[in-house]
């Protein structure tokens, strides 16, 4: 059997029914839409309109707000950092920070800083200078013999 011999099973793929193409086709004239009215016409449905019933977006109350001072961090796991070190993309002897992670291709776009999470294992002794880290990540870094420098009140 060759790739060019492969065929779909008969009846498994139905041809698309073209509507509104003459009465002989069975779906000509009104094309399965019935007769007249808003639903028979094209492009006239009103988004969110529920036929006069109070729409869901007005029945439910407004909630929350967008904090314009919120910081967005690049989240990186210890496993990804170890993989970059093993691949030779990241130097374990140099300080690991936002710039070095970006240069190594671990993160794509730099945001307000890097936050390290404890997923995976860290075997290398690494010095970090980052915006945040989880408690478990700090423990794993110190257990591996590394150090971590965080801004005040960033370790949570």
From Swiss-Prot:
PROSITE patterns noted in UniProt: RIBOSOMAL_L15 (PS00475)
Family matches, as Gene3D superfamilies: 3.100.10.10
A single MF term (Gene Ontology): rRNA binding
Span list, region Disordered: 1-44
Keywords in alphabetical order: Ribonucleoprotein, Ribosomal protein, RNA-binding, rRNA-binding
Entry-linked InterPro entries: Ribosomal_uL15, Ribosomal_uL15/eL18, Ribosomal_uL15/eL18_sf, Ribosomal_uL15_bac-type, Ribosomal_uL15_CS
Domain of life, per lineage: Bacteria
Assembly notes: Part of the 50S ribosomal subunit.
HAMAP family, sorted: Ribosomal_uL15
PANTHER family: 50S RIBOSOMAL PROTEIN L15 (PTHR12934), LARGE RIBOSOMAL SUBUNIT PROTEIN UL15M (PTHR12934:SF11)
The protein, known as: Large ribosomal subunit protein uL15
Organism this protein belongs to: Brucella canis (strain ATCC 23365 / NCTC 10854 / RM-666)
């Amino acid at each position: 059997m060759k790739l060019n011999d492969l065929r779909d099973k008969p009846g498994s793929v139905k041809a698309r029914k073209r509507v509104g193409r003459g009465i002989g086709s069975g779906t000509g004239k009104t094309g399965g839409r019935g007769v007249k009215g808003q639903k028979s016409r094209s492009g006239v449905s009103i988004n969110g309109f529920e036929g006069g019933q109070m729409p869901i977006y007005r029945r439910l109350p407004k909630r929350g707000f967008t904090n314009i001072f919120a910081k967005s961090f690049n989240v990186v796991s210890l496993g990804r950092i170890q993989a970059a070190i093993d691949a030779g993309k990241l130097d374990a002897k140099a300080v690991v920070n936002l710039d070095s992670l970006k240069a190594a291709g671990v993160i794509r776009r730099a945001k307000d800083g890097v936050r390290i999470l404890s997923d995976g294992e860290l075997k290398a002794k690494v010095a970090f200078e980052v915006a945040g880290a989880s408690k478990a990540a700090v423990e794993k870094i110190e257990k591996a013999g590394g150090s971590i420098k965080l801004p005040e009140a960033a370790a949570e």
